[in-house]
């Protein structure tokens, strides 16, 4: 299967730079599957995960807080505010942040709008999904 170059960068650092067979992400208009030779595209991406299929058919997961995805004939670039490899996520920290976000929604925290609170909870749930998917992929390798 043909490959293409994928670059994933956050505001702080380069997260991924290499040849891949494909990626899956959630764009502003729905789910995207990108393979080599995809037509050019520029789209906003929603907070969630990017699932990468590497050259050796292994998979990697990256949490994305949102951003943009650009597809060119031989290169795909993901520009994200925050991007964290699934293997670098800390389950306990995610669960604690999720618990706090849920408490803030229930108590109606005065320092934030309801939409901001729900957005925070959604980001933590996406991180948890990235962690769990990475954990499953890691167990499959064993």
Curated annotation (Swiss-Prot):
Protein name, as recorded: ATP synthase epsilon chain
What organism is listed for this UniProt entry? Histophilus somni (strain 2336)
- Give me the Gene Ontology terms describing cellular component: plasma membrane; proton-transporting ATP synthase complex
Q: Name one GO molecular function term.
A: proton-transporting ATP synthase activity, rotational mechanism
| Entries under Pfam families matching the protein | ATP-synt_DE_N
Where located? Cell inner membrane
Source organism lineage? Bacteria, Pseudomonadati, Pseudomonadota, Gammaproteobacteria, Pasteurellales
Q: Does the keyword Cell inner membrane apply?
A: yes
Going by the UniProt record, its keywords in alphabetical order are: ATP synthesis, Cell inner membrane, Cell membrane, CF(1), Hydrogen ion transport, Ion transport, Membrane, Transport
- What's the chief localization of this chain? membrane
Entry's family note: Belongs to the ATPase epsilon chain family.
**Could you tell me the membrane topology recorded for this protein?**
Peripheral membrane protein
SUPFAM superfamilies recorded: Epsilon subunit of F1F0-ATP synthase C-terminal domain, Epsilon subunit of F1F0-ATP synthase N-terminal domain
């Amino acid at each position: 299967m043909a490959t293409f170059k994928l670059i994933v960068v956050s505001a702080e650092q380069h997260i991924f730079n290499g040849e891949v067979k494909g990626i899956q992400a959630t764009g502003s208009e729905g789910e995207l599957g990108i393979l080599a030779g995809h037509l050019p595209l520029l789209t906003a991406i929603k907070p969630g995960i990017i699932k990468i299929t590497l050259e050796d058919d292994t998979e990697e997961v990256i949490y994305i807080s949102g951003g943009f995805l650009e597809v060119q004939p031989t290169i795909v670039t993901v520009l994200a505010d925050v991007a964290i490899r699934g293997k670098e996520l800390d389950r306990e920290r995610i669960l604690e942040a999720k618990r706090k976000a849920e408490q803030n929604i229930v108590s109606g925290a005065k320092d934030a709008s309801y939409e901001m609170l729900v957005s925070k909870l959604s980001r933590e749930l996406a991180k948890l999904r990235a962690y769990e998917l990475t954990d499953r992929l890691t167990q499959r390798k064993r």
